[in-house]
Curated annotation (Swiss-Prot):
This is Electron transfer flavoprotein subunit beta. Abundant in liver, heart and skeletal muscle. A weak expression is seen in the brain, placenta, lung, kidney and pancreas. It is linked to Glutaric aciduria 2B: An autosomal recessively inherited disorder of fatty acid, amino acid, and choline metabolism. It is characterized by multiple acyl-CoA dehydrogenase deficiencies resulting in large excretion not only of glutaric acid, but also of lactic, ethylmalonic, butyric, isobutyric, 2-methyl-butyric, and isovaleric acids. The modification N6-methyllysine is found at residue 200. It comes from Homo sapiens. The modification Phosphoserine is found at residues 223, 226. One of its GO terms (cellular component) is mitochondrion. It is found in: Mitochondrion matrix. InterPro entries: ET-Flavoprotein_bsu_CS, ETF_a/b_N, ETF_b, ETF_beta_N, Rossmann-like_a/b/a_fold.
């Protein structure tokens, strides 16, 4: 069996099926009493790590999440999918709401060094903020090569071949390990955790640490000025002829 070790980042986000509501004070979105789940792109990253282990190319898969106590539920999901153990970097809820890609990348970089992993896998972006920055920043802090938007990953000895979709075709990268890879939707289809694996996950270890244990300051240099609901779409108007359409467009100043 290979001795490679993989760190997979998993983020707890508001479930994609939930209708987002803005807080009355417009400082963010309502999270209390709202269903949360693992970020879909993170699920893909976990699945890829587990598949590498099933092929006996990886020795250990470690799932990590940064946030409030409820993040342990997200880690348990990763453990049920096949990750070996979890690390919860506990952050108070109020502070967790202000976490950005820069702070999370600092945490991931420190953990990658501490755990001596060979590969950091994470989703290309999270569906709550769509930043698409954490993987790139993590690679920057570690000074590791990176393969973003991966649609196929192949381990070749001490190198990783990454295919990524770009405008007009495919780009193939060959990265020397250790490396950072971010997962695209086309990389794989995540499995559903079976009941036996869900039960086994309850017995797997989750280590709880603080950002300070890693020497990381989570103070953000960004502040949210205001969060607004998207403007309501105005009702459409049915027109019978091309002439009516042109007249209507002139009326509203579009032509």
């Amino acid at each position: 069996m290979a001795e490679l070790r993989v760190l997979v980042a998993v983020k707890r986000v508001i479930d994609y099926a939930v209708k987002i509501r803005v807080k009355p004070d417009r400082t963010g979105v309502v999270t209390d009493g709202v269903k949360h789940s693992m970020n879909p792109f993170c699920e893909i990253a976990v699945e890829e790590a587990v598949r590498l282990k099933e092929k006996k190319l990886v020795k250990e898969v470690i799932a990590v999440s940064c946030g409030p106590a409820q993040c342990q539920e997200t880690i348990r999901t990763a453990l049920a999918m096949g990750a070996d153990r979890g690390i919860h970097v506990e952050v108070p809820p109020a502070e967790a709401e202000r976490l950005g890609p820069l702070q999370v990348a600092r945490v991931l970089a420190k953990l990658a060094e501490k755990e001596k992993v060979d590969l950091v896998l994470l989703g290309k972006q999270a569906i709550d903020d769509d930043c698409n920055q954490t993987g790139q920043m993590t690679a920057g802090f570690l000074d590791w090569p990176q393969g973003t938007f991966a649609s196929q990953v192949t381990l070749e000895g001490d190198k990783l071949k990454v295919e990524r979709e770009i405008d007009g075709g495919l780009e193939t990268l060959r990265l020397k390990l250790p490396a950072v890879v971010t997962a695209d939707l086309r990389l794989n289809e995540p499995r559903y955790a079976t009941l036996p694996n869900i039960m086994k996950a309850k017995k797997k270890k989750i280590e709880v640490i603080k950002p300070g244990d890693l020497g990381v300051d989570l103070t953000s240099k960004l502040s949210v000025i205001s969060v607004e609901d998207p403007p309501q779409r105005t009702a459409g108007v049915k027109v019978e002829t091309t002439e009516d359409l042109v007249a209507k467009l002139k009326e509203i100043g579009r032509i």
